[in-house]
């Protein structure tokens, strides 16, 4: 009888411990999922994209004098598929998120080349949209702020076009780029879409863009 009572008490205690541990495990899983979403190369809910997420990406890059965190929210109503990233200067250790459904945001980063080199981080990323056209995002974080400033641009190209030096020059010199002036800027992109974006003026640059229906 005594042994049976001990077994029953042990089973009750075990069940109570398990019931308490489950919510804790679920909370830890939620924390891990949230942390995993706030890294470059990931896709997250577009509504949750904000400067705090981009700051987390910058911190993960570490102590680099020229770096950028990019977040692009897809509210276009169509899914996007990654094409490529082109860097005129600088680099990234991150692969572009392959698929960005509507309602989601892609996260990406870039940094100057390692070592004592006088370069910034300048490049273009491209995505094929559901209608077959190409969304291009250009960013420029210079090394020398005595001569240059932060700039960014977003444009839709007809058909499938890969990011390249030619595309960079088009977006930087000829397509009315926006200065990284710590302010928001809007533009009609055509094809039934418009954009709204922000870039700061720092060497630790934040670029947040939302592409939505016009």
Swiss-Prot record:
A motif (Cell attachment site, crucial for protein stability) lies at residues 179-181. Residues 140-155 are annotated as: Trp-rich region, which is important for the binding to lipid membrane. The keyword Lyase does not apply. It comes from the Eukaryota. GO terms for biological process: cytolysis in another organism; monoatomic cation transport; pore complex assembly. Phosphocholine binds at residues 89, 122, 140, 142, 168, 172-173. The keyword Phosphoprotein does not apply. One of its GO terms (cellular component) is other organism cell membrane. GO terms for molecular function: channel activity; toxin activity. Keywords: Cleavage on pair of basic residues, Cytolysis, Ion transport, Membrane, Nematocyst, Secreted, Signal, Target cell membrane, Target membrane, Toxin, Transmembrane, Transport. Residues 22-35 form a propeptide. Residues 1-21 form the signal peptide. Pfam families: Anemone_cytotox (PF06369). Its main location: secreted. Octamer or nonamer in membranes. Monomer in the soluble state. Belongs to the actinoporin family. Sea anemone subfamily. It comes from Anthopleura nigrescens. InterPro entries: Actinoporin_PFT, Anemon_actinoporin-like, Cytolysin/lectin. Residues 38-47 are annotated as: Plays an important role in the hemolytic activity. This is Nigrelysin. It is found in: Secreted; Nematocyst; Target cell membrane. Pore-forming protein that forms cation-selective hydrophilic pores in cell membranes and causes cytolysis. Pore formation is a multi-step process that involves specific recognition of membrane sphingomyelin (but neither cholesterol nor phosphatidylcholine) using aromatic rich region and adjacent phosphocholine (POC) binding site, firm binding to the membrane (mainly driven by hydrophobic interactions) accompanied by the transfer of the N-terminal region to the lipid-water interface and finally pore formation after oligomerization of monomers. The record marks 148 as: Important in the initial contact with the lipid membrane. Residues 46-65 are annotated as: N-terminal region.
């Amino acid at each position: 009888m005594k042994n049976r009572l001990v077994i029953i008490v042990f089973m009750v205690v075990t069940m109570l411990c398990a019931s308490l541990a489950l919510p804790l495990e679920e909370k830890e899983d939620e924390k891990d999922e949230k942390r995993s979403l706030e890294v470059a190369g990931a896709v997250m809910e577009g509504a949750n994209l904000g400067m705090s997420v981009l700051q987390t990406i910058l911190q993960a890059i570490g102590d680099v004098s020229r770096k950028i965190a990019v977040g692009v929210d897809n509210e276009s109503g169509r899914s996007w598929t990654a094409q490529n990233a082109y860097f005129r200067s600088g680099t990234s250790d991150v692969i572009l998120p392959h698929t960005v459904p509507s309602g989601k945001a892609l996260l990406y980063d870039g940094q100057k080349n390692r070592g004592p080199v006088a370069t910034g981080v300048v490049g273009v990323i491209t995505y094929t949209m559901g209608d077959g056209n190409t969304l291009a995002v250009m960013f420029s974080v210079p090394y020398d702020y005595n001569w240059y400033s932060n700039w960014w641009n977003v444009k839709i190209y007809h058909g499938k076009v890969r990011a390249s030096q030619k595309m960079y020059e088009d977006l930087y010199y000829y397509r009315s780029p926006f200065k990284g002036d710590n302010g928001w800027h809007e533009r009609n992109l055509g094809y039934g879409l418009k954009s709204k974006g922000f870039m700061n003026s720092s060497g630790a640059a934040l670029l947040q863009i939302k592409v939505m229906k016009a």
